[in-house]
Amino acid sequence: MNLPRAERLRSTPQRSLRDSDGEDGKIDVLGEEEDEDEVEDEEEAASQQFLEQSLQPGLQVARWGGVALPREHIEGGGGPSDPSEFGTKFRAPPRSAAASEDARQPAKPPYSYIALITMAILQNPHKRLTLSGICAFISGRFPYYRRKFPAWQNSIRHNLSLNDCFVKIPREPGHPGKGNYWSLDPASQDMFDNGSFLRRRKRFKRHQLTPGAHLPHPFPLPAAHAALHNPHPGPLLGAPAPPQPVPGAYPNTAPGRRPYALLHPHPLRYLLLSAPVYAGAPKKAEGAALATPAPFPCCSPHLVLSLGRRARVWRRHREADASLSALRVLCKGSGERVQGLRRVCPRPRGATATCSSDHQACCIPRPLPLCCKCPPPPLLGQFCSNSSSIRRRTAPTAALPPRARCWAGTCRPRRPC
């Protein structure tokens, strides 16, 4: 292609010039060899381009990352011409966008499930809630749990069942609904440190309930013994008794409803249940229900308390003669039986003798028949003196059996009270 130029350069004659000395000198053409090298490089590049175009017409090699791309993609026929533009489609989103998405999600509250349940119960006016009510409060108060509602409901249920600080209260009769109520144990009010729900002092453990401990009842109990909250309750069992009780001693029951007998763990009750029933006492008709215990005709609150103390002493020292003699009531052959009460005569070891017709069984001072013709014990003397006329009007003398068992050496001769 450039051959005529090369031949022209070679065929140019050498010009002669004179030196300062007058001698002829030769001038070489500078850059002749360099021009030849450049011509050869251009020829090689042109031949290589010609070969590539002849083999792949319509294609042009674009070296980007060692990959040959079609001409139309390089010139802008559907693909990015700039490598920086090519990578923008597959580039990861910036960190600011991910941070903004995390910021929009609500954070988890720093409270435990026990603290959340306690908040829900305390905000209720009645201080009790069902499981659904507790979950509704937590969802409405904290948006984090609102978005993840079904996942943590079982955790609330497990915490209610496994922690002693929560007490299950049955639903009141006549109030339709599903599920029981849950409340806080009164002894767990100081469970959190300084009222802060973030710090819990220690795991609450419910202690064993003591006899007579007050439990919160969701609805009023049926007619029961008035001594439920008495420090010295004494259950009295017997058949329905017509005598009128002392005003204020026991609650009045509704007509047509059977009152329940108090089953209270008291030493006096164990004493009554473990003692044999007096065999000679007249039996009431079968099917008679438990009635409201009738008080003593000559009784007072001081007498009931004293009898309870004497019964506990006998319970602890029942084999000691000194304690047994303090608990006995001496009776004679004929007397009066208070209607509605039973005669129970426990007998210590070794007592096998039977008294004569002039004597009657010795009894323990509890709801026992009192005789108007027996010497009252020192404890009952101050109360029985003013009530002999009342006892004569309440029960006939012929109601008592002629014979009874008693302990040997404990009965005294008959004498009027």
From Swiss-Prot:
Q: Which source organism does the UniProt entry give?
A: Homo sapiens
One term under GO cellular component: nucleus
Top-level taxon: Eukaryota
SUPFAM superfamilies given for it? Winged helix' DNA-binding domain (SSF46785)
- Pfam families the record matches: Forkhead
Upper taxonomic classification of the species? Eukaryota, Metazoa, Chordata, Craniata, Vertebrata
**Entries under InterPro entries matching the protein:** Fork_head_dom, FOX_domain-containing, TF_fork_head_CS_1, TF_fork_head_CS_2, WH-like_DNA-bd_sf, WH_DNA-bd_sf
An example GO biological process term is: regulation of transcription by RNA polymerase II
Question: What Gene Ontology molecular-function terms does this entry list?
Answer: DNA-binding transcription factor activity, RNA polymerase II-specific; RNA polymerase II cis-regulatory region sequence-specific DNA binding
UniProt protein name: Forkhead box protein D4-like 6
Q: Where is this region: Disordered?
A: 1-50, 70-105
Here the segments flagged for biased composition (Acidic residues) are: 30-45
First-listed, main subcellular location of the protein, grouped into a coarse class: nucleus
Q: Which residues bind DNA?
A: 108-202
Keyword list, A-Z? DNA-binding, Nucleus, Transcription, Transcription regulation
Stretches with biased composition (Basic and acidic residues): 1-29
Compartments annotated for it: namely:
Nucleus
